């Protein structure tokens, strides 16, 4: 099993994402509650789940669930940006603009885009 497949399976087993394996670590500029930093993102059904990535092997703490059905203004950086430093993507939900950077899994962004477009 390849590393990405193992990672996807671990994330599914932990409940972070569904069978599509759309999960990754990223840096968030700011969440509505003022928190920021490293987070673990997962797409489960039509929701984006945001977990605290505390890096201390503690149980995952769900920080926020964002229904992707109401997301607007989704955008991502170009392929060249991804090659150099990882994707940045942003969107607006309930009047707040979320911005994530250092994302290195195109498959995650593909699933996210599919759910937003439903």
Regions found by a protein language model. Give the residues of each.
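Membrane-topology and secretion signals of cell-surface/extracellular proteins
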Residues: 3-14, 51, 76-77, 88, ...
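Canonical phosphoinositide-binding patch of PH/PH-like domains
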Residues: 92-111
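IQ-motif-like calmodulin-binding regions
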Residues: 116-117
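Short amphipathic alpha-helical segments
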Residues: 3, 63, 104-108
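Anionic N-terminal interaction surfaces
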Residues: 1-43
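Phosphoinositide-binding peripheral membrane targeting modules
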Residues: 31-40, 44-86
């Amino acid at each position: 099993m390849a590393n990405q497949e193992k990672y996807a399976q671990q994330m599914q087993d932990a409940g972070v994402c569904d069978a599509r394996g759309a999960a990754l670590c990223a840096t968030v500029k700011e969440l509505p509650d003022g928190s920021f930093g490293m987070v673990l993102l997962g797409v489960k059904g039509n929701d984006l789940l945001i977990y605290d990535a505390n890096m201390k092997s503690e149980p995952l703490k769900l920080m926020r669930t964002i229904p992707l059905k109401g997301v607007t203004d989704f955008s991502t950086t170009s392929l060249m940006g991804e090659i150099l430093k990882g994707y940045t993507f942003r969107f607006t939900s309930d009047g707040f603009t979320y911005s994530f950077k250092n994302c290195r899994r195109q498959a995650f962004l593909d699933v996210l885009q599919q759910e937003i477009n439903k």
